[in-house]
Structures are given as C-alpha cells and as structure tokens.
Amino acid sequence: MSTQEHKTFWPLMKDCITAEDKTAMIEFIQNAGRFTNGPMVKKFEQEWSKWLGCKHSLFVSSGSTANLLLVAAIKEKYNLKEGDKVIVPAITWVTNISPIMQLGLQPIFCDVDPVTFSFNTNHLKTLAAAHHDIKAIFISHLFGISADVDAYKAILGPKVTFIEDVCESHGATY
C-alpha cells in the first residue's frame, strides 16, 4: 500500500491588475474629488446592471459589507426574528456566516459536496427533517459553479427564504 501523499492545488485567483489599470487608479486617486458614490461608481453600477439584466446594482466597500447589508435587508423584508434558523454551508467564507450571527440569527451548518462545495443534499434533507422551523438558507455559489437551487427548493419548500452570494460566480448560469 502506498503512503504517498496526494496534494491538489486550486488557485483561487491570479493577479489580473495590469500596468494600465494601476496607472488609471493612480490618476483617479490624484484627480478625483471623492472616492465613493461619484460619477464613475454610478456609471459602473448602471453598466453592471445592464450586463446582469437587472434593474439596480449597489456597490459597497467589500463582500463583507455586501453580505451584512443583504442579510439585514432580508431580515427586515421577511420579518426574521432573533434566533431564527438559517442554513449555511459548513465550508464557506466567514463573511457568509458572521452577518447572520451579528444580526441575531442562528446559523445551522450543512455539510458540503467535496467537488462543488455546494450543499450536500442528503445532509440538507436531514437538517430539514430535524429543524421544521428553518427560516432561510444562505447559498454561496463558489468557483463559478452554480449551486443546485432547484434541488434545495424541492427539499426546503416555499416557506424558506433563499439568500444567495454570487461574488465568485458573476456571469455563471444555472
């Protein structure tokens, strides 16, 4: 029997900032009257919305901020209360879980598929059977791979609110 270790390396990203990008950023910093909510941000939001085929886009300082605003908006719109249960992936970014905890909701961790890093549907079924009071599920579409949202809806039913983080899957289709 071989004791040879098998290591797989998955690069998360490559440096894609060109010299031209750096020059443009330096010029912007030197000449801009303001760094946030300026005309370039508005233009980018409009172009991004058009590319996505949606009505509005809102750009914020980070993915952490985006997730906090997203969960806060969902909590208010769907009247989630302190202690309400939200299913989250057991392997994900901390910024998918921290806003749930910051806003007083209870994360329920679901195992993930080792290939897609999306929810393991067998474990999701187990959680749905054990917790009849689940209010939401926070889905992360990782590495450009769209999660099987239809399967999750079939398991959880129409009363569960779906929250989706697609920061790693812009342009992916399902």
Which ranges hold each PLM region?
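Conserved PLP-binding active-site segment in aminotransferase class I/II-type PLP enzymes
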Residues: 1-81, 102
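Alpha-helical structural signal in soluble globular domains
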Residues: 47, 57, 99, 103, ...
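Short active-site oxyanion
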Residues: 55-56, 84-85, 136
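Flexible loop residues that form catalytic
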Residues: 62, 91, 142
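Conserved PLP-anchoring active-site segment centered on the Schiff-base-forming lysine
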Residues: 71-131
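Active-site phosphate-binding strand-loop segment of PLP-dependent enzymes
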Residues: 115-174
